[in-house]
């Protein structure tokens, strides 16, 4: 009986540590979200790269990275945003 109690205690401690470890990994992962979009079209020659926001964000978005290392949120349904994304994909 004592062996099974000790084994159960070890199992519970191991589960608690694994759960703690996986929770801390998820908390350290940054998620970039857009809460508003740029109201102006950015000149295409200013754009160096882009990425899409996470599905965990409340609004979908495309984040353009400028050549001056700034991040600009844009509405993915805008025609110019789709063109820039397409052009960046073709040049990659």
From Swiss-Prot:
Keywords: Chemotaxis, Cytokine, Disulfide bond, Inflammatory response, Secreted, Signal. This is C-C motif chemokine 3. Belongs to the intercrine beta (chemokine CC) family. Self-associates. Also heterodimer of MIP-1-alpha(4-69) and MIP-1-beta(3-69). Interacts with CCR1. Its main location: secreted. GO terms for molecular function: CCR chemokine receptor binding; CCR1 chemokine receptor binding; CCR5 chemokine receptor binding; chemoattractant activity; chemokine activity; identical protein binding; kinase activity; phospholipase activator activity. Induction: By TPA or PHA (TPA = 12-O-tetradecanoyl phorbol-13 acetate (tumor promoter); PHA = phytohemagglutinin (T-cell mitogen)). N-terminal processed form LD78-alpha(4-69) is produced by proteolytic cleavage after secretion from HTLV1-transformed T-cells. It is found in: Secreted. PANTHER family: C-C MOTIF CHEMOKINE 3, SMALL INDUCIBLE CYTOKINE A. The gene is CCL3. Gene3D superfamilies: 2.40.50.40. Pfam families: IL8. Monokine with inflammatory and chemokinetic properties. Binds to CCR1, CCR4 and CCR5. One of the major HIV-suppressive factors produced by CD8+ T-cells. Recombinant MIP-1-alpha induces a dose-dependent inhibition of different strains of HIV-1, HIV-2, and simian immunodeficiency virus (SIV). The record marks 40, 68, 70 as: Involved in GAG binding. GO terms for biological process: antimicrobial humoral immune response mediated by antimicrobial peptide; astrocyte cell migration; calcium ion transport; calcium-mediated signaling; cell activation; cell chemotaxis; cell-cell signaling; cellular response to interleukin-1. SUPFAM superfamilies: Interleukin 8-like chemokines. Coiled coil: none annotated. Residues 1-23 form the signal peptide. GO terms for cellular component: cytoplasm; cytosol; extracellular region; extracellular space. Disulfide bonds join 33-57, 34-73.
